[in-house]
């Protein structure tokens, strides 16, 4: 328990609140101070790697863009492959895509068609779970590729935005792990 409290305190101490960004009334959670601190960044990626191993994942999918920053070193530490899930049009070659609804419109994410296959167990990694739209689309994409969802791991969950409730049906019993609850 003490170790969990210590990592929680360390991570929280390195996340900066930026008021009125990107628009008035929003408090942006800036993780760049955490990334700049080798001890905090190592603790974070180590915790994500441990969750990856605990849930039997064979690959990590990192969601654009901060999921790349967190997921790649976690994959190295866990000894698993790393797969970037990008916004549509950013990957060369054959891709699988998944559209999802936003509050005002829609968006689309993609993965290389050959990167996920039957037998893969995939942990989705991102910095924040907010409304859950991108994470939900990534789970659909992973399953369409024939892979299995091992879980979703995030640095922080913004509980007041309801992402967990939205994601619950798509998880289909897979775990959602948030290192911090905001």
UniProtKB/Swiss-Prot annotation:
It is found in: Cytoplasm. It comes from the Bacteria. Its EC number is 2.4.2.7. GO terms for cellular component: cytoplasm. Pathway: Purine metabolism; AMP biosynthesis via salvage pathway; AMP from adenine: step 1/1. Homodimer. HAMAP family: Aden_phosphoribosyltr. NCBIfam families: apt (TIGR01090), PRK02304.1-3 (NF002634), PRK02304.1-5 (NF002636). This is Adenine phosphoribosyltransferase. It comes from Streptomyces avermitilis (strain ATCC 31267 / DSM 46492 / JCM 5070 / NBRC 14893 / NCIMB 12804 / NRRL 8165 / MA-4680).
